[in-house]
């Protein structure tokens, strides 16, 4: 299965928000033009590293920086041999949790930690709806929940995400607007993309219900794996991930480790 960044849907999304996308042999190459300097060329979790194509595009778009986030340690070693260096600041999560969705709903629930089970059972009557057709309301609740503390995507970006992924996107939110999350699906994998919870939602543990609903819905539309899109990684310590990690680990699953971000400058 391909990473979501290598799907046609994701390519369509980035092309709508200011990136140039070249797609060759089912690999997405993302180009961001920078005035006066040239451009940045980014390749994220490709099935293989096609260095001849990368060189061709770097020359075509006058790339002063090439960023590659490989899938395997073998690909990472290959990049190092070509002069790429491991960045201390990864773009994509380098460590994540995944759940096997080919299991039954009952088996998935059984593998949850005690606190997750308890929160989900207590929240059985919480109203959760897909706000895909009211993104302004969804974003408004998100903005109100986090204030200036965290980045909230522009409404146009959320609309582009919906347009690109169509029925493979979910914008779930509780009826009281205290918690919500975006879930995306691509090539058999469902992703816990972005989320928000206000103080009331945290006190009621409503994000547990949101995630559980998201898991069930992406499973229903055919996803075989659920990806939490990042947990704390000791190799690239970022304390802001610790709280999210405790929450995500309460859903069980298994860890998946990625090599990191490799960069080469051509200035």
Where does each model-flagged region fall?
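A conserved beta-strand-loop-helix scaffold within acyl/acetyltransferase catalytic domains
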Residues: 1-37, 82-202, 217
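Short catalytic/ligand-binding loop motif for oxyanion handling, primarily in non-cytosolic enzymes
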Residues: 37-39, 74-77, 234-236
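STAS-typified acidic loop motif
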Residues: 39-49
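Short beta-strand segments
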Residues: 42-44, 65-70, 194, 225-230
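Non-catalytic accessory segments adjacent to catalytic cores
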Residues: 49-96
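Short amphipathic alpha-helical segments and helix-helix/interface helices
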Residues: 51-58, 76, 120, 158-162, ...
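Aromatic (often tryptophan-rich) hydrophobic motifs at membrane interfaces
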Residues: 55-57, 167-267
């Amino acid at each position: 299965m391909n990473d979501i960044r290598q799907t046609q849907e994701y390519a369509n999304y980035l092309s709508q928000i200011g990136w140039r996308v070249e797609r060759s042999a089912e690999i997405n190459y993302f180009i961001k033009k920078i005035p006066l300097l040239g451009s940045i060329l980014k390749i994220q979790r490709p099935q293989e590293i096609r260095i001849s194509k990368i060189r061709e595009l770097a020359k075509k778009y006058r790339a002063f920086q090439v960023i590659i986030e490989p899938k395997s340690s073998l690909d990472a070693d290959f990049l190092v041999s070509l002069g790429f260096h491991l960045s201390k600041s990864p773009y994509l999560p380098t460590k994540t949790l995944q759940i096997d969705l080919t299991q039954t709903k009952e088996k998935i629930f059984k593998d949850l930690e005690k606190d997750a089970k308890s929160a989900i059972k207590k929240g059985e009557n919480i109203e959760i709806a897909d706000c895909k057709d009211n993104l302004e309301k969804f974003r408004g609740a998100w903005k109100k929940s986090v204030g200036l503390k965290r980045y909230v995507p522009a409404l146009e970006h959320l609309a582009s995400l919906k347009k690109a992924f169509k029925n493979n996107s979910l914008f779930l939110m509780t009826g009281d607007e205290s918690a919500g999350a975006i879930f995306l699906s691509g090539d058999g994998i469902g992703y816990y993309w972005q989320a928000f919870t206000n103080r009331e939602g945290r006190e009621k543990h409503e994000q547990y219900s949101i995630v559980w609903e998201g898991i069930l819905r992406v499973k229903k539309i055919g996803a075989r794996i659920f990806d939490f899109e990042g947990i704390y990684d000791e190799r690239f310590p970022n304390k802001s991930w610790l709280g999210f990690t405790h929450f995500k680990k309460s859903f069980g699953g298994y860890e998946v480790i990625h090599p990191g971000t490799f960069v080469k400058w051509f200035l």
